[in-house]
């Protein structure tokens, strides 16, 4: 049985510029709590602006996104109902991340484990996406159920 829950994160920092030591530099990857979002853009979970003095820009964006966690053996089936990315583990393994659309809402998907995703969405879309995910969990296409 899977769980859909909102995750409280300590902070989120957007870092722009040259890669910092230990940052991922390949598309669709994450290193720990550092998500690669583009050629010169990362999202650091739990970081602080002052931790990146050599970055072109480091901005606290903690209020910019709400984070959901979706976990369960059929998590890919739930997400496939509203996302066109191939989320099979051979293509999107643990540590993978991507900016995409989920049910027409712009999100960041981060696969943290084989059966667990974090979904980052703008606060204005949070009620819509929460309702969509709850509906998707009860879909006949999924054996997942929310608690």
Per-range role (PLM):
Residues 1-147:
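Basic, glycine/lysine-rich polyanion-binding surfaces/domains
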């Amino acid at each position: 049985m899977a769980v859909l829950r909102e995750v409280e994160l300590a902070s989120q920092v957007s870092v722009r510029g040259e890669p910092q030591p230990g940052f991922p530099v390949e598309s669709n990857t994450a290193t720990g709590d550092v998500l690669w979002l583009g050629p010169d853009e990362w999202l650091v979970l739990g970081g602080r602006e002052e931790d990146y003095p050599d970055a072109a820009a480091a901005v606290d964006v903690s209020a910019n996104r709400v984070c959901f966690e979706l976990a369960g053996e059929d998590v890919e089936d739930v997400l496939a109902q509203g996302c066109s990315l191939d989320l099979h583990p051979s293509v999107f393994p643990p540590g993978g991340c991507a900016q995409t659309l989920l049910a027409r809402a712009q999100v960041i998907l981060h696969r943290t484990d084989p059966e667990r995703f974090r979904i980052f969405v703008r606060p204005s879309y949070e009620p819509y996406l929460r309702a969509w995910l709850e509906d998707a969990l009860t879909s006949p296409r999924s054996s997942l159920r929310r608690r």
